[in-house]
Amino acid sequence: KYQRALNNWKNRKKSDWDIGIEYERYIGYKLECEGYKVTYIGATLGLKDMGRDLLATKNGKTLIIQCKRWAKEKTIHEKHLFQLYGSAAVYAIEHPITHCKAVFITTTELSEVARKCAEYCDIAVVENCPMGDYPLIKCNANKDGEKIYHLPFDQQYDKVVVSKNKQSCYAWTTYEAEGLGFRRAYRWHPNKS
């Protein structure tokens, strides 16, 4: 029943918001595979994310990442780079001991002016980075050691940390997650005794 729910969720009609979050999660997954600890800001704060979709930390360095999943015929203009630059500056001020780097990742291309602005502002840019398929089920152990899996429509999904250890992984299907000894996350109910 949970696999059917996941399949229905994957095949539903998606809003622009859903498409953006899906891309942020994909980029976050790729970074986690490279050993980064990823915080999903855009998915949890929405429009209040200040242009920071992801924070990815590894070896004392934090990447402040803005993701844009746009149609190929669209072009990214400089205002998006300026927003990221300002957001990275605020982050650096608020976290003075952290070495940080602004990174802009998109499925399309930047205008020539936007490229020059990125270079001037020392923003790393990844253009034409397509959305790919990846395992959507997050599996981890809770504070009591219970092995739990989370589906992308679960309330806490974007707060679940997946790291490279035996108690944490991604799975393609609910059957795979259950075969690894994980159970479905319970729905959270406030004031439950």
Model-found features: residue ranges?
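Generic structural signal for hydrophobic residues
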Residues: 23-27, 114, 173
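Catalytic cores of nucleic-acid endonucleases
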Residues: 59-62, 67-127
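Active-site metal-binding core of divalent-cation-utilizing nuclease and nuclease-like domains
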Residues: 38-59
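Mature, structured domains enriched in cysteine- and short glycine motifs
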Residues: 124-193
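Short, well-structured beta-strand/strand-turn elements
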Residues: 37-45, 181-188
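Acidic-basic catalytic patches of nuclease active cores, encompassing PD-(D/E)XK
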Residues: 1-42
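Short, composition-biased local secondary-structure segments
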Residues: 1-4, 70-94, 131-155
